[in-house]
From Swiss-Prot:
SUPFAM superfamilies: S-adenosyl-L-methionine-dependent methyltransferases. Gene3D superfamilies: Vaccinia Virus protein VP39. It comes from the Bacteria. Pathway: Cofactor biosynthesis; ubiquinone biosynthesis. InterPro entries: SAM-dependent_MTases_sf, UbiG_MeTrfase. It catalyses: a 3-demethylubiquinol + S-adenosyl-L-methionine = a ubiquinol + S-adenosyl-L-homocysteine + H(+); a 3-(all-trans-polyprenyl)benzene-1,2-diol + S-adenosyl-L-methionine = a 2-methoxy-6-(all-trans-polyprenyl)phenol + S-adenosyl-L-homocysteine + H(+). Keywords: Methyltransferase, S-adenosyl-L-methionine, Transferase, Ubiquinone biosynthesis. This is Ubiquinone biosynthesis O-methyltransferase. The keyword S-adenosyl-L-methionine applies. S-adenosyl-L-methionine binds at R47, G78, D99, M141. Belongs to the methyltransferase superfamily. UbiG/COQ3 family.
Length: 253
């Protein structure tokens, strides 16, 4: 399959070309639950449940329903190969997945076709999206630690929300613990990810993320951490936000 440019041109883009190249190399491994993306596969059910439950509370839906998100428009910014797009499509959402890496989008399209799912995948950036498009749910999961300007990026994400919509952001805290676990542990000891996947100085503290969201006229309504138990080899939602964490934000009115 022929690939187009990896970085859709946009003068205001917050995309970092080096980050795109890094994740493009991993595109063939996205859907291997035992490969380098194994940690994402293990945390994915918890991410899906957290987002689903937040959306159901917001839009008065039954989280136990197989179509709990039916009719809701969702965009997953930096969707990779679609690990979140597919489960939310199965829950009834109308999903658009965007990624600046053409190879990631190609991998996403192939897997969606195999899974017989209709997902609108686009090789583009948040900044290049039609400003008239609005969504009930905007996802920016494990993305902001890879952009060049967090505030500008989140401002663009906020502009894509409907007035009654919500945004969910996931990222990594910046402290000694996240350096030890997310970089030394994940990249050098466990070798879950290639060395250099993350840059510790680009991690974002919950306080910083909250301020960025407030600057975009959003208010944080929910938050949770994701904690790894090495003895059980399992991830769980937790109040501990020292390393991986997620936030839900809505219009501050």
């Amino acid at each position: 399959m022929a690939m187009q440019s990896e970085t859709p041109g946009n003068p205001a883009s917050t995309v970092d070309p080096a980050e795109i190249a890094k994740f493009s190399k991993l595109s063939a491994e996205w859907w291997d639950p035992t490969g380098r993306m194994a940690p994402l596969h293990k945390i994915n059910p918890h991410r899906v449940a957290f987002i689903r439950d937040a959306a159901c509370r917001k839009f008065d839906r039954n989280p136990k329903s197989l179509n709990s998100l039916a009719g809701l428009r969702m965009i997953d910014i930096g969707c990779g190969a679609g690990l979140l797009c597919e489960p939310f499509t199965r829950l009834g959402a109308q999903v658009i997945g965007i990624d600046p890496s053409a190879t990631n989008i190609a991998a996403a399209k192939v897997h969606a076709e195999k899974s017989r799912l209709l997902i609108d995948y686009r090789n583009t950036t948040a900044e290049a999206m039609d400003p008239r498009e609005r969504f009930d749910i905007v996802l920016a999961m494990e993305v902001i630690e890879h952009v060049t300007d967090v505030g500008a990026f989140l401002g663009r994400c906020a502009a894509m929300m409907k007035p009654t919509g919500l945004m969910v952001v996931a990222t990594l805290n910046r402290n000694w613990k996240s350096f030890a676990l997310a970089i030394v542990g994940a990249e050098y000891v466990m070798r879950w990810l290639p060395r250099g996947t993350h840059q510790w100085d680009k991690f974002v503290t919950p306080e910083e993320l909250t301020r960025h969201l407030q600057n975009s006229r959003l208010a944080v309504t929910e938050q949770a951490g994701l904690v790894y138990n090495p003895l059980a080899d399992k991830w769980n939602l937790s109040a501990d936000m020292d390393v991986n964490y997620m936030m839900v934000a809505e219009s501050a009115g």
